[in-house]
Amino acid sequence: MAKKESYEDMLGKLQDILSTLEDDNLNLEEGMKSYEDGVKLVNKLYKTLNSYEGKISVIKEEKEVEFENQDGDR
């Protein structure tokens, strides 16, 4: 099973793609391929951020319940 790419690794690849797309000597086919790869990476990054946002929300909710229970004990 392949190791899951880190957010930072994917972001680095996206930055490389952006640099490639800014190259004036890039031909159309290479540009389209780079653009497609970039869009795929943006989607992966977006999904990763949404996943972490969901995890953070769950943790916050659990902690809020803990705090509410502690306040009620006093």
From Swiss-Prot:
Belongs to the XseB family. SUPFAM superfamilies: XseB-like (SSF116842). It comes from the Bacteria. It catalyses: Exonucleolytic cleavage in either 5'- to 3'- or 3'- to 5'-direction to yield nucleoside 5'-phosphates. Pfam families: Exonuc_VII_S (PF02609). One of its GO terms (cellular component) is exodeoxyribonuclease VII complex. The gene is xseB. It is found in: Cytoplasm. GO terms for biological process: DNA catabolic process. InterPro entries: Exonuc_VII_S, Exonuc_VII_ssu_sf. Keywords: Cytoplasm, Exonuclease, Hydrolase, Nuclease. It comes from Clostridium botulinum (strain Eklund 17B / Type B). Heterooligomer composed of large and small subunits. Gene3D superfamilies: Exonuclease VII, small subunit. One of its GO terms (molecular function) is exodeoxyribonuclease VII activity. Signal peptide: none annotated. Bidirectionally degrades single-stranded DNA into large acid-insoluble oligonucleotides, which are then degraded further into small acid-soluble oligonucleotides. This is Exodeoxyribonuclease 7 small subunit. Its EC number is 3.1.11.6.
